[in-house]
Structure formats: structure tokens, C-alpha cells
Amino acid sequence: QKSLQPDQMKELDALIDAETGALKFVPNPGPQTEAYFSLADELYYGGAGGGGKTSLICGLAVNCHHDIQMFRREAVQLRGLVKELSKIIGSTTGFNSQLGVWRLQDGQTIELAGVKDEADKEKWQGREADLKCFDEITHFTRSQYRFIIGWNRSTRRTATASPGPCCSTSTTCRPRCASWSSAAPRAIRTTWRN
């Protein structure tokens, strides 16, 4: 196999930079890109371990939204989100681990929270965000999920990530996962923004 010469590599890097602009996260080709550019208000994205589920929701948060809430069932599980976000952002500057709040230089706010007990959902009553992410959605109860997303408005978005058998592509969900959807009898509720 022949590798690129340093000048060719530099030229390739320049082409990539020109195409991606100021994006801190660029989705992988295929399903992750489809999910990233989906206009669905509720986005279910799944796959095998290491398939980029957490990367997708972190990338959406950093590149596309201003007020973000990211959830795991247990607060200790948030470490994976912190690690992925710091990789995308480039540092942990602005992250307050005591509060679970990340304030970025451009004014973005990313809140990280565990929703361990059923009653913990109440803490999010009336708390709007332009992106609500649930990492490992199958760990949450349907009630927790529906209550928390209930505070989204017409231009808001919810993204979920789950392991393999639940969700197969960016906008389809198999029946086992459908109980988290607002329209449980259907495979997924997809509301398109205009």
C-alpha cells in the first residue's frame, strides 16, 4: 500500500477543512450522517457498542444547539458523556463537575444529569432546551422519557441513543423501543419541522 506524501496529506487536510468549516464534530459516513442531518423532532439512533451513538448526540449538542440537556439513568454514567464532549470540544474548560454544567465560550450551555429515581423527572419540569439527549434510552422508564420531553416546544429536538436491537437507523425504531415513543403503537413518532 502506498501512503500519501506530506504535501498530499496537507492538501487533503485543507480540502477536509474547507468542507467541514468550523464544525467541531463531523459525523461518520452512513447512518450516523443520516441521523445527524435528520429533521425529525424525535430521533432514535442505535447500534452496536462503539458504533458512535454517544458521539452523535455529543456532536449534535456541540455543533447544532445552544441550550442542551443530556441524560443518563445514573449520574455516575455521565463520565462517558464528559469524556466524549471533552474530546469534541478539545478540553474541559467551562465544565463544572459539581453542577454538571458545561458553559462554552459562545454561550452554549450543556447540562448533564442522572435520572435515577422515577421522581427525578420532576426536576426537569418546565425546563426547556433546544436539545434533550437520552444516552442509553432503554435504561429510562417510558414515564421519565415522556415527562422530560413534554417540555419541548415546536422547534425543539429530542435525540436518543440505544444499543443494538432497539433502534436500527436514524429514524426507525423496532417495537421493543417503541414504548419510549410518544406514539407507541407506531414504530416511531416523526414530526418534521418546516
Language-model-detected regions and their locations in the chain:
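Short, flexible loop motifs at catalytic/binding sites
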Residues: 1-194
